[in-house]
Amino acid sequence: MKKICLILLVSAFTTPLFSQQLAVINFLSPRFETPNFLWIGTTYDFGKIKVNRPVTHEFRFTNSGDAPLVISSVQASCGCTVTDYSRDPIGPGSEGYVKATYNAAKAGVFSKTITVNANAAESVVQLTIKGEVVE
């Protein structure tokens, strides 16, 4: 009699467990919204330029991600390069820019970098301007 009561008691508690559905969570491919840079070019060659004549190039990009892209800072490698950039959030599919103006004080070959920090998948991007300054 004890065995029958024990079997009935165990089956009374385990039957509801088998009737519940399990929640399946996919941990392998989480979906996060992220902004992403799609640059038209990351290097620009000015060629030959004159001393003390500023030259400017505008690097353009598209936010190919699915969240707003925000540039937090843009820094040039030296004081001879002044930068400007899109300061408002760039929505998915929209375009933005980083502008670099270089003013050479002496003749010679140059190569300068502009570092872009943003909330994109590639959070730090290096842009390069180069050329040759002639008298």
Task: Give the residues covered by each predicted segment.
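Sec-dependent N-terminal signal peptides
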Residues: 4-13
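Short, solvent-exposed loop/linker segments at beta-strand-coil boundaries, enriched for Pro/Gly
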Residues: 77-84
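Asparagine-centered strand-capping/turn motif at beta-strand->loop junctions
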Residues: 61-65
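Positively charged n-region of N-terminal signal peptides that target proteins for export
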Residues: 1-4, 20
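Terminal connector regions
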Residues: 108-135
